[in-house]
């Protein structure tokens, strides 16, 4: 074979190899395109995602693609369409209270990253229930937990997490800078109210869906404060009560009507012989009922009810089963303040059923220990101390604290009535437990049911002191 023939042969072989390679590459491209079409052709991109989602440590894996989604809760099988929570249903008939949640946050916080908190409360939308709380800007078992017995500081903030979970940096959502707060959902968005600032010039910041919409300046310059539990939404309007003035004498009390975060009306209560603090409010047949704390001179609880025009009535629970702490032994009640052991108090709640009342209270008369629910069938209007039902929730030997009401609307439960619920704060640490350098709490909650319930104790259960305390 001469040199020219060798060159032609080698060139032909190279060209053949190149053509084969090109054909293989084209086949590879076609196969990838066909495979992609098969995978995506049948998907409806506007519908609900049917992929399997596995959540671990606040991160989401979707088809082996890592996506970090912070503070996002996927509510499976729920229609997320906005609604208007009517709030016009009556309270559900109940026979007792079923345990609903327990977060065990102090126990978990001995080893995990859990916020130092107080004043937890629960509020529900038509899709979910969340625990709100006032953090101290510190974690349990950390040096910044020192001195957190203080109520008001610039480090406190209103945050929220899914109900039943220990509040941590990994599952909690920031809501507002606050040392006093309230929150509620109207079916379309969350309203949050956070009060912060100096005692003589605090300001309440209103947010709707996370955006500042309004502010309220302290009008008496005496520690503006609000409910420390959920506000109430009825037919698109939300209602809250604020107090400004002395904690041991007559103060100023205002009701605010709020729509999408904007104040549309407010009134001041004419109640010179009453004292209203830290009200626990709920809707009932289109009206709002609030049961509050008298820190001035009442060992029974004051109440105020009002309609959507803010026409109101006031009074005190008449029952001789007294609901505040400290309080005297049960006996002769009054529809006015019962002044025996009436000074000081603790946030609490009651539910009215006609002339009857479910009273939530500490088991101890003098300290924040234990908790029980009592059904007094005539206690709203009569002054005797007779009752029919007592359900134990926390034993006398275990610490409790604040308590408050929240409801589950029919839009959430599917019932034709408003389900009454309540939460109890289980305070640990200072000032009572002096082996610690901190003050914090966990929480439990219960909901009313018309079926069997248990008498038991669901205490905080943490073993103190922690490592930081030694």
Curated annotation (Swiss-Prot):
Q: Which reaction does it catalyse?
A: Hydrolysis of alpha-(2->3)-, alpha-(2->6)-, alpha-(2->8)- glycosidic linkages of terminal sialic acid residues in oligosaccharides, glycoproteins, glycolipids, colominic acid and synthetic substrates
Give me the ranges of the annotated region Hypervariable stalk region: 36-90
Quote the subcellular location field of this record: Virion membrane; Host apical cell membrane
Q: Which UniProt keywords apply?
A: Calcium, Disulfide bond, Glycoprotein, Glycosidase, Host cell membrane, Host membrane, Hydrolase, Membrane, Metal-binding, Signal-anchor, Transmembrane, Transmembrane helix, Virion
Q: Signal peptide position in this chain? A: none
Positions annotated with a glycan in the UniProt record:
44, 58, 63, 70, 88, 146, 235, 365, 455
SUPFAM superfamilies from the entry? Sialidases
In this entry, the parts of the chain located on the Intravirion side of the membrane are 1-6
Primary localisation category: virion
Q: Where does this protein hold Ca(2+)?
A: 294, 298, 324
- Under Enzyme Commission nomenclature, its number is 3.2.1.18
Q: Enumerate the residues binding substrate.
A: 118, 152, 277-278, 293, 368
So what family is this one in? Belongs to the glycosyl hydrolase 34 family.
HAMAP family tied to this protein: INFV_NRAM (MF_04071)
Q: What is known of its domains?
A: Intact N-terminus is essential for virion morphogenesis. Possesses two apical sorting signals, one in the ectodomain, which is likely to be a glycan, and the other in the transmembrane domain. The transmembrane domain also plays a role in lipid raft association.
Question: What is the protein's known function?
Answer: Catalyzes the removal of terminal sialic acid residues from viral and cellular glycoconjugates. Cleaves off the terminal sialic acids on the glycosylated HA during virus budding to facilitate virus release. Additionally helps virus spread through the circulation by further removing sialic acids from the cell surface. These cleavages prevent self-aggregation and ensure the efficient spread of the progeny virus from cell to cell. Otherwise, infection would be limited to one round of replication.
Complexes and interactors: Homotetramer.
Descriptive protein name? Neuraminidase
Which lineage do the record's taxonomy fields give for this organism? Answer: Viruses, Riboviria, Orthornavirae, Negarnaviricota, Polyploviricotina
